[in-house]
């Protein structure tokens, strides 16, 4: 693969995967940069945000960070009146939970973005956008997940046209 990036949420699974990649690059003194795709949902636990900031800053010498702050649609079950909400919605900037991170990529950075787009659709379109931007021949997106947690996660793994790699670790 000539283009590799990790999808990093700031959670345990993607955090372990990202740290394993960083350790491998450093341990083997590889002269490559690893892409990191982080969808910043605005409303996240402070400790998660702090962890994301810390890991990205500490490894900026080997990471190409794509921290996206996009007002895509996100499903919600917290309202009787809305079926979705939008992080980083411009018209609601006065009630944002926190300030947008420095160097965040916004909707202006992505020509494919449209207001009817859901977060999962954005992920898929981002992959194609990055592949084209890097003029890549083969792109690899690494995702650290436990399939027991979500049917959608399981479905993503077993969709066609993907390589599945499992290392034989003694957990």
Give residue ranges: language-model regions.
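ATP-dependent adenylation/nucleotidyltransferase module used to activate substrates
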Residues: 1-171
